[in-house]
Regions:
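Functionally critical transmembrane alpha-helices in membrane proteins and complexes, commonly lining
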Residues: 1-48, 57-66
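Hydrophobic alpha-helical transmembrane segments
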Residues: 3-12, 73-75, 94-99, 154-155, ...
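Hydrophobic alpha-helical segments of integral membrane proteins
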Residues: 7, 40, 46-47, 69, ...
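Structural signature of transmembrane alpha-helix termini at the membrane-water interface
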Residues: 9-12, 16, 44-47, 51, ...
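Interfacial loop-to-helix transition and helix-capping segments at the boundaries
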Residues: 22-35, 87-102, 140-157, 183
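Hydrophobic cores of alpha-helical transmembrane segments in multi-pass inner/ER membrane proteins
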Residues: 35-45, 98-110, 155-163
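Membrane-interface helix-loop-helix regions
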Residues: 56-110, 124, 128-141
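Aromatic-enriched alpha-helical transmembrane segments of multi-pass intramembrane proteins
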Residues: 90, 114-183
Length: 183
């Protein structure tokens, strides 16, 4: 809930940040961690289900991208020939649609992360984080079109959510068992 509120607030105050130091500082603080928080939460609740991946996420991405493409052509009068053609514009995420695109990619890696975490324990989680950070750093060396670099840049946060889930579940169970006595 807090993450959603911060995203909405951040997008709202973005247009008012110039000239107001408090608003600008608030915007910077929100932007510093809100996407990382979303990615960690996405990893914490992730479940691998190929059918849902296709019927929900892929479908939502394709419909959203098609609507955005129509908006860009009709309202913004964008010339797609300058950016690689209509097919490239349709396949590559535009602006905020990148998160749906990222979730599809990240969910495809979920079985590997879960196998590392479940079979190798803490060592597997450390290895999974090292691989995720390595992928993000390596992908940062490539000049990706549009916002694709975000898919890789935020991947370690998603992996962190996936890899830390058992520890957080154990912590929640421990806290539930050791509640203070209420009078």
């Amino acid at each position: 809930g807090l993450g959603i509120l911060l995203v909405v607030l951040g997008h709202f105050i973005e247009q008012y940040r110039m000239g107001y130091s408090f608003v600008s500082a608030s915007f910077f603080c929100i932007c510093a961690f809100h996407m990382a928080l979303f990615c960690i939460c996405s990893g914490l609740v992730a479940r691998f289900n190929p059918r849902k991946l296709v019927t929900q996420q892929l479908w939502l991405y394709l419909v959203g991208q098609t609507l955005m493409l129509a908006f860009r052509a009709a309202v913004l009068r964008e010339n797609f020939a300058e950016t690689g053609g209509l097919l490239a514009a349709w396949l590559l995420p535009w602006r905020h649609i990148w998160y749906l695109y990222a979730l599809i990619f990240w969910h495809l890696t979920l079985p590997v992360l879960c196998r590392l975490r479940d079979r190798l324990g803490l060592a597997g989680s450390c290895l999974g984080m090292a691989l995720a950070v390595g992928l993000a750093l390596t992908a940062g060396l490539v000049d990706w079109p549009f916002t694709l670099v975000r898919v890789f840049a935020f991947y370690p946060f998603y992996a962190c959510g996936v890899l830390l889930r058992p520890q957080l579940d154990r912590l929640a169970a421990f806290a539930a068992e050791h509640r203070p006595v209420q009078l």
